[in-house]
Amino acid sequence: MDVVKKSRNTHGSNDFSELIVSVRRVAKVVKGGRRFSFSVLVVIGDEKGKVGCGIGKHLEVSEAKVKAVNAARKNMIRVHLRESRTLHHDIQAKFCSSKVMLRSAKVGTGIIAGGSIRLIFEVLGVQDVVAKSIGSSNPHNVVYAVFTAFRKMLSPKQVASKRSRKIGEIIENR
């Protein structure tokens, strides 16, 4: 069961958008039968380049969501964006059997992505991107594959230092 729910959370100076990617009822088999609980996958972001994901489990969905949001706040990462609207370069990543391809796009393209990838880019603040998910469409694995790609991404400053060049040379050769 995939549920998309967007909310603004304003606790102090942190202003994050929260999106529920999936809600699942899971069971633990015990001697007396099955114990049911809920597992919630949440992505949060400030729509300015910071994003995080987290999973929470509890007997109630609302409590599981609170746990997931707290886990997502602990897993926040910074993604360097070009002109605050798209990615700096194309990238591919894999997690388990889910593979994702993320490509930067021209102005006005929009977010061309499906399922849980679209939700990540919405809370990240990306406006123009093309993304493709190959293999397993399990929301957990797809989200983790996207985060693997974000961690592998390099800013122009990092590329310039690796190549012993100036940042201007890297940017003009796009």
From Swiss-Prot:
| Keywords (A to Z) from UniProt | Ribonucleoprotein, Ribosomal protein, RNA-binding, rRNA-binding
Q: Which residues form the S5 DRBM domain?
A: 16-79
Q: Which InterPro entries match?
A: Ribosomal_Su5_D2-typ_SF, Ribosomal_uS5, Ribosomal_uS5_bac-type, Ribosomal_uS5_C, Ribosomal_uS5_N, Ribsml_uS5_D2-typ_fold_subgr
| GO molecular function list | rRNA binding; structural constituent of ribosome
Keyword Membrane, does the record have it?
no
Role noted for this protein: With S4 and S12 plays an important role in translational accuracy. Located at the back of the 30S subunit body where it stabilizes the conformation of the head with respect to the body.
Quaternary structure note: Part of the 30S ribosomal subunit. Contacts proteins S4 and S8.
* Protein name per its UniProtKB record: Small ribosomal subunit protein uS5
Lineage runs:
Bacteria, Pseudomonadati, Pseudomonadota, Alphaproteobacteria, Rickettsiales
Gene of this entry: rpsE
